């Protein structure tokens, strides 16, 4: 379980500003806090009668999703529209990609149409980095999820949710529960929590759904729900990603729910003001009980709302960083 992006900060320009948003690995705490603060300021836009600001007017954002998505794709579309960008969403199932066109050829054709930014979701880990290295450097690349590797905007919207409900990270205990092995969300959340100073990060899963080397993320590993949930402030549930599983990692979904499903009884072991989160889609009766998903501890729908603001922040900051980099290069070329 080695991070793909521990070398040079490809995501940043020469001034240390966001240029692409590929992963949370290697990003400093100050930058993550800036993203959260910027998103906080954008939450007010969603309450307006006219939900628009002109920050990306005249810019074109292309959403290119090679995997199915509802929340991520829709919230990226809304985020770009609220920033006044022109938005194109490529339906990969009806595009030339379904006829054998390569990922790079698809994006280069879109690039030739003068797109300013690509939001890409792909099933291969490292796809976003590959695109950022090979597409025109003036085009910002935002990772909407790549394989098992990373889902940085989901990680940041989860951090915004925690901060708005808990005030900060320095004294929190956070448990991430479920299919850790196949979850890009788990990786992004572990990185973000560690960077933002959370002192107690726990992962709870059966041994077959824990990746090798997970200890490098500075987490405590539990294989018992009762023990792992004791006195936690935040529970982040993850779905079973059957589409990524090979072999008999689990006896059955029913057995998983019996041992690792979040029920009202199990949640009673957490702190009384604990919040429950889930990136979606929810599988009720598999990883979470309906009474918990719809109950007073749940902030799952808040996550969706905060997701729009986080994606507005990332889109605007990456576009600003690209513009600053071009100005820097022009000045130094004179």
Swiss-Prot record:
Q: Which GO terms describe its biological process?
A: 'de novo' pyrimidine nucleobase biosynthetic process; 'de novo' UMP biosynthetic process; amino acid metabolic process
Q: Which UniProt keywords apply?
A: Pyrimidine biosynthesis, Transferase
According to UniProt, this protein's pathway is: Pyrimidine metabolism; UMP biosynthesis via de novo pathway; (S)-dihydroorotate from bicarbonate: step 2/3
Instruction: Return one GO MF term.
Output: aspartate carbamoyltransferase activity
Q: Which superkingdom does the taxonomy of this entry point to?
A: Bacteria
Task: Provide the E.C. number(s) assigned to this enzyme.
Answer: 2.1.3.2
Q: Record-annotated residues binding L-aspartate?
A: 99, 184, 239
One Pfam annotation reads OTCace
Q: Please name the InterPro entries in this protein's record.
A: Asp/Orn_carbamoyltranf_P-bd, Asp/Orn_carbamoylTrfase, Asp/Orn_carbamoylTrfase_sf, Asp_carbamoyltransf, Asp_carbamoyltransf_Asp/Orn-bd
Q: SUPFAM superfamilies given for it?
A: Aspartate/ornithine carbamoyltransferase
Regarding protein family, the annotation reads: Belongs to the aspartate/ornithine carbamoyltransferase superfamily. ATCase family.
Q: Which NCBIfam families match?
A: asp_carb_tr (TIGR00670), PRK00856.1 (NF002032)
Classification via PANTHER family: ASPARTATE CARBAMOYLTRANSFERASE, ORNITHINE CARBAMOYLTRANSFERASE, MITOCHONDRIAL
Q: What does this protein do?
A: Catalyzes the condensation of carbamoyl phosphate and aspartate to form carbamoyl aspartate and inorganic phosphate, the committed step in the de novo pyrimidine nucleotide biosynthesis pathway.
Name the record gives this protein:
Aspartate carbamoyltransferase catalytic subunit
Name the source organism: Pseudomonas fluorescens (strain Pf0-1)
Gene of origin? Answer: pyrB
């Amino acid at each position: 379980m080695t991070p793909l992006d521990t070398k040079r900060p490809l995501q940043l320009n020469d001034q240390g500003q966001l240029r692409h948003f590929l992963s949370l690995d290697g990003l400093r705490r100050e930058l993550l806090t800036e993203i959260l603060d910027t998103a906080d300021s954008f939450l007010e836009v969603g309450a307006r009668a006219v939900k628009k600001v002109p920050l990306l007017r005249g810019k074109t954002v292309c959403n290119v999703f090679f995997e199915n998505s509802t929340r991520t794709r829709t919230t990226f579309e809304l985020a770009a529209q609220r920033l006044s960008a022109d938005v194109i969403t490529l339906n990969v199932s009806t595009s030339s990609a379904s006829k054998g066109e390569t990922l790079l050829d698809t994006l280069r054709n879109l690039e030739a149409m003068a797109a300013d930014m690509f939001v890409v979701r792909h099933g291969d880990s490292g796809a976003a980095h590959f695109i950022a290295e090979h597409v025109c450097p003036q085009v910002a690349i935002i990772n909407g999820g790549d394989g098992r590797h990373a889902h940085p905007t989901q990680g940041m919207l989860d951090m915004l949710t925690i901060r708005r409900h808990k005030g900060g990270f320095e004294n929190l205990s956070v448990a991430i529960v479920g299919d850790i092995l196949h979850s890009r969300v788990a990786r992004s959340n572990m990185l973000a929590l560690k960077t933002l100073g959370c002192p107690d990060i726990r992962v709870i899963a059966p041994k077959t759904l824990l990746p090798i080397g997970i200890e490098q993320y500075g987490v405590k590993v539990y294989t018992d729900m009762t023990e792992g949930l004791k006195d936690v402030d935040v529970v982040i549930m993850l779905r079973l990603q059957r589409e990524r599983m090979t072999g008999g990692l689990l006896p059955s979904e029913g057995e998983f729910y019996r041992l690792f499903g979040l029920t009202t009884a199990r949640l009673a072991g957490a702190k009384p003001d604990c919040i429950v989160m889930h990136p979606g889609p929810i599988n009720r009766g598999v990883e979470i009980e309906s009474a918990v998903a719809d109950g007073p501890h749940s902030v799952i729908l808040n996550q969706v709302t905060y997701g729009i603001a986080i994606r507005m922040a990332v889109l605007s900051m990456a576009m600003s960083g690209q513009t600053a980099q071009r100005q820097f290069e022009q000045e130094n070329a004179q």
